[in-house]
Amino acid sequence: YFLLHGVTGSGKTRVFQKLIAETLKQGKQAILLVPEIALTPQIVGQFQSLFGNAVVVMHSALTDRQRQDAYQRMQNGTAKIAIGTRSAVFAPVQNLGILIVDEEGERTYKSENAPRYHAIAVARKRCQTHHCPLLLASATPSIESYYYAKKGVYTLLELKKRYRNMPLPEVTVVDMN
């Protein structure tokens, strides 16, 4: 397992794209989890511009027909990349090559409704079963993941600079009282 700890704007999405491209070259499929439905259009657009029709979207706001189509395409191998929220961890891949969890410290990866599950725990088990890498990524990793990385359970990868050395945005605190 790997923990990619990168500052905001360091190019984590670009790393995901390169890793997934390598996975597809090996004839395997990939799952990319994002913490919220609102984040899917932007990242799906970026991946579709690179990988075209190989990308499917999976989240709870899809219609039954859209969900069924995405599942069938992943199951029969016509789609190679599933991008979605926590439920996408159950995508019916035949040959999983990598599973990536973006913003892994977000609490939205834990389902509070029945059936209760933690998508990251499911991801670990799927990667163990498929003998493939799990990449957890965040600018603010969970304490658990950071602890495992520091103890050597996870391999810690760090992106300490922003892409092209862009400066961080300037923040001003204003007292509204």
Listing of model-derived features with the role each one plays in the protein:
Residues T85-R86, D102-E104:
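Walker B catalytic acidic pair
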Residues S10-V15, E22-S49, Q66:
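Conserved Walker A/P-loop ATP-binding site and its immediately adjacent core
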Residues Q46-A54, M58-A82, V93-L96:
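Conserved motor-coupling elements within RecA-like helicase/translocase cores
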Residues Y1-G6, I31-L33:
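Short hydrophobic/aromatic beta-strand immediately N-terminal to the Walker A/P-loop
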Residues L24-K25, Q75, C127-Q128:
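Conserved ATPase "switch" residues in P-loop NTPase domains
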Residues G9, T13, I98, G105-T172:
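Post-DEXD/H (motif II) to motif III coupling segment of the RecA-like Helicase ATP-binding lobe
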Residues V55-D64, E106-Y117, N177:
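Flexible beta-alpha connector loops of hexameric P-loop NTPases
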